[in-house]
Amino acid sequence: IYGGDPQELSLLIKPYARRIEISGETLFCYTPDPEQVRAQLRGHRGLRLLERPPNLEDVFLRLTGREMGKYQ
């Protein structure tokens, strides 16, 4: 989810998410029921949502983290 205040949005969708991550202005929400999350976000203008099934990239990011410059 991109747009809006990620902290505020995370509180709104927290009951429907198994895990939430915030990286910069983007909120990553891992949920078994994306429709519940979309329903909570209806009416919030200026949001961009991307929905996709989990894959090996998610496993990699979970193990290594999202920040590239973390270990420099």
Curated annotation (Swiss-Prot):
<keyword id="KW-1003">Cell membrane</keyword>
<dbReference type="GO" id="GO:0005886">
    <property type="term" value="C:plasma membrane"/>
</dbReference>
<comment type="function">
    <text>Part of the ABC transporter complex NodIJ involved in the export of the nodulation factors (Nod factors), the bacterial signal molecules that induce symbiosis and subsequent nodulation induction. Nod factors are LCO (lipo-chitin oligosaccharide), a modified beta-1,4-linked N-acetylglucosamine oligosaccharide. This subunit is responsible for energy coupling to the transport system.</text>
</comment>
<keyword id="KW-0813">Transport</keyword>
<keyword id="KW-0997">Cell inner membrane</keyword>
<protein>
    <recommendedName>
        <fullName>Nod factor export ATP-binding protein I</fullName>
        <ecNumber>7.6.2.-</ecNumber>
    </recommendedName>
</protein>
<comment type="similarity">
    <text>Belongs to the ABC transporter superfamily. Lipooligosaccharide exporter (TC 3.A.1.102) family.</text>
</comment>
<keyword id="KW-0547">Nucleotide-binding</keyword>
<keyword id="KW-0067">ATP-binding</keyword>
<keyword id="KW-1278">Translocase</keyword>
<keyword id="KW-0614">Plasmid</keyword>
<comment type="subunit">
    <text>The complex is composed of two ATP-binding proteins (NodI) and two transmembrane proteins (NodJ).</text>
</comment>
<dbReference type="GO" id="GO:0005524">
    <property type="term" value="F:ATP binding"/>
</dbReference>
<keyword id="KW-0536">Nodulation</keyword>
<keyword id="KW-0472">Membrane</keyword>
